[in-house]
């Protein structure tokens, strides 16, 4: 007898090259597939190396988007019932976006000593270093 699998409850999708095409947009075909999944009760969760502030509005506007995994998995956000307003109320002074506030459900912080060691290694190799803090990416200019 064939093995029965549980119903899919969540689909996590990387942004660049997966959810977004080469031009940085969601295709109509992808949008239709996401809508079909949402109609079956599946959570669609963007997962990205980007900080929350860099989530494209087009992604936040997709049907069924409520949760987002950011910073390469270091933070999980609940955007509530108004994802666009949640993301942009946090990072914008525009009054029209102040409809809700994102809630950080989980964040994994690097110990300070480990961060210092990583910074020293990157500096010695002249490597780019990005630090994510409070939903923003910080770089040494």
Each model region followed by its residue ranges:
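Active-site phosphate-binding/coordination module
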Residues: 28-93, 98-141
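Mg2+-dependent phosphoryl-transfer enzymes with acidic/Ser/Thr/Gly-rich catalytic loops
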Residues: 2-10, 26-28, 39
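Asp-based phosphoryl-transfer active-site loop
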Residues: 9-23, 118
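Preference for short coil/turn "hinge" residues that link or interrupt alpha-helices
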Residues: 1, 12-13, 19, 58, ...
């Amino acid at each position: 007898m064939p093995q029965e699998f549980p119903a899919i409850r969540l689909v996590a999708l990387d942004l660049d090259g997966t959810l977004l095409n080469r031009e940085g947009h969601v295709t109509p075909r992808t949008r239709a597939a996401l809508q079909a999944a949402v109609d079956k009760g599946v959570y669609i969760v963007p997962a990205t190396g980007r900080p929350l502030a860099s989530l494209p509005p087009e992604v936040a506007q997709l049907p069924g988007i409520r949760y987002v995994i950011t910073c390469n998995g270091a933070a999980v956000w609940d955007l509530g019932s108004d994802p666009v307003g949640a993301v942009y109320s946090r990072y914008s002074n525009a009054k029209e976006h102040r409809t809700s506030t994102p809630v950080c459900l989980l964040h994994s912080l690097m110990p300070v000593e480990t961060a210092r060691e990583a910074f020293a290694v990157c500096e010695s190799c002249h490597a780019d270093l990005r630090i994510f803090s409070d939903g923003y990416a910080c770089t040494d200019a």
